[in-house]
């Protein structure tokens, strides 16, 4: 399923929302009343020029930063994050640009990194021994479910290509998220073939029912995969665009401020 046949509709349920987020770093205002809306079953790309506030927005949504003002709403309930662990507890998983995979560990160990399954009884509760067999079995199941073609879950991540490593990171997020997956530049520094591999995996995550927030500077990838495009500008939500109705050049013009959103035809807005 590509973006042109995505199931997303304007009436889709709002999964995650932010209203009036403000974030200041000393004298610098990174977010100045930013709004955000993520719908069920969509891939929402977040784009913006340097200093537009997209990174601060994503940090607030993932719990990495606490906003000074405003509110974040998940499934209709206002939530407050003190840190990324709080976001993970409510089913929001984030893959940052630096991947955060452990190269020397196996794929199975990476999938359960920080969420290791322990053996039952004395062995697990007292001796803290891991149930490696169960983790391996579940890793195989989860990777097969997302159709990630990696030969063995017992091979070290350092033996994988860049695209395969990114797929491991995305699959780990999808395995434990039950609300939202946030991906920060998932195809950065990847070749064409590996970039396409990651994009296809992101589609499958979406098609499994998890909405995806995709932060990217790669406009061809954004237009290939996104259902809607959130444009961050000057610390606010500049516009939300329909990639099937607006050109890439006009999108860049909106992002840089050369084209005011109010001058766009209504069909270009989403």
Where do the protein language model's features map onto the residues?
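Glycine-rich phosphate-binding loops of nucleotide-dependent enzymes
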Residues: 2-270
């Amino acid at each position: 399923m590509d973006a042109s046949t995505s199931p997303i509709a304007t009436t889709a349920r709002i999964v995650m929302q932010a209203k009036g987020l403000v974030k200041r770093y000393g004298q610098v205002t990174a977010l100045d009343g930013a709004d955000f809306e993520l719908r069920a079953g969509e891939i929402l790309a977040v784009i913006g020029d340097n200093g537009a506030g997209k990174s601060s927005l994503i940090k607030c949504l993932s719990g990495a930063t606490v906003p000074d003002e405003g509110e974040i709403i998940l499934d209709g309930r206002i939530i407050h994050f003190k840190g990324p662990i709080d976001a993970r507890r409510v089913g929001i998983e984030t893959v940052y640009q630096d991947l955060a995979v452990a190269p020397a560990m196996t794929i199975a160990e990476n999938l359960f990194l920080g969420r290791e399954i322990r053996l039952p009884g004395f062995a697990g509760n007292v001796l803290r021994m891991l149930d490696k067999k169960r983790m391996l079995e579940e890793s195989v199941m989860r990777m097969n479910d997302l159709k990630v073609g990696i030969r063995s879950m017992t091979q070290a991540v350092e033996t994988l290509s860049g695209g395969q490593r990114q797929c491991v990171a995305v699959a780990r997020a999808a395995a434990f998220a039950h609300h939202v997956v946030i991906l920060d530049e998932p195809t950065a520094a990847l070749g064409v073939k590996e970039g396409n591999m990651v994009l296809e995996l992101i589609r499958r995550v979406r098609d499994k029912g998890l909405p995806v927030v995709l932060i990217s500077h790669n406009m061809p990838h954004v237009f290939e995969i996104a259902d809607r495009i959130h444009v961050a500008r000057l610390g606010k939500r500049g516009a939300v665009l329909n990639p099937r109705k607006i050109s890439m050049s006009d999108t860049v013009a909106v992002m840089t401020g050369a084209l005011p959103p109010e001058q766009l035809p209504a069909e270009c807005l989403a």
